[in-house]
Amino acid sequence: MSATKTLEAVARDRVGKGAARAVRRQGQIPAVIYGGNQAPQAIAIDLIRARTLIYAGGFKTTVFEIDAGGKKTRAIPRDYQLDPVSGVPLHVDFLRVVAGQTVTVDVPVHFVNEDQAPGIKQKGGTLNVALHTLSLEVAPDQIPDAIEVDLAGREIGDVIHASDLRLPAGTYTGEPTDTVANLLPPTVLGADVEAEEAAVAEAQSAESAEGKAEAEAEATNEKNKSEA
């Protein structure tokens, strides 16, 4: 489970596009904390700190204790906006964490022991991943960093369903039969190329034989004409 992280912030008394631009000029980004049957709280957080947290991974599954001028609030990121060109964070939305309530988060799926899967290591199969994240509804202090899928012993043709994974009971929001990944047989490019080349050679041979037969028939006709 992810540990709660501290995030320093500054309370904002002005909102809107003009106020947001002013915040960004100061090396911060605007953010808001909402939910928990309380009024939204506008804050600003350090740009470099926000960028580091977002690009480090696991940002949206981490609970933060946000300290805005001495007022501390536990919250989890629900969304963020990035500049489409530079990738710089522009805004973050936080959801208040309330005791006794659950949150829905998308937890990344990590595949381990791929080198111990005979279908991949010895037989050249390919791991086809259908779900890179799983949506879980859990208590904030029970959010896993990632969901591990053990590939040891897996063979070509094996299908891994959500029900095969070790998840906190009753937390997965999808269906138990959802396919997470499967092992596909290798694509035999060499055999395909050889088959194609053989087909081309056969067609060329047939064309050559047909041309030879036509030439022989024409020569016979010419001979018959000259003898007549």
From Swiss-Prot:
InterPro entries: Rbsml_bL25/Gln-tRNA_synth_N, Ribosomal_bL25/Gln-tRNA_synth, Ribosomal_bL25_b-dom, Ribosomal_bL25_C, Ribosomal_bL25_long, Ribosomal_L25_dom, Ribosomal_uL5_bac-type. Residues 196-228 are annotated as: Disordered. GO terms for biological process: translation. The keyword RNA-binding applies. Residues 209-228 have a biased composition (Basic and acidic residues). GO terms for molecular function: 5S rRNA binding; structural constituent of ribosome. Keywords: Ribonucleoprotein, Ribosomal protein, RNA-binding, rRNA-binding. Disulfide bonds: none annotated. Pfam families: Ribosomal_L25p, Ribosomal_TL5_C. GO terms for cellular component: cytosolic large ribosomal subunit. It comes from the Bacteria. Part of the 50S ribosomal subunit; part of the 5S rRNA/L5/L18/L25 subcomplex. Contacts the 5S rRNA. Binds to the 5S rRNA independently of L5 and L18. This is one of the proteins that binds to the 5S RNA in the ribosome where it forms part of the central protuberance. Belongs to the bacterial ribosomal protein bL25 family. CTC subfamily. This is Large ribosomal subunit protein bL25. The lineage of its organism: Bacteria, Pseudomonadati, Pseudomonadota, Alphaproteobacteria, Hyphomicrobiales.
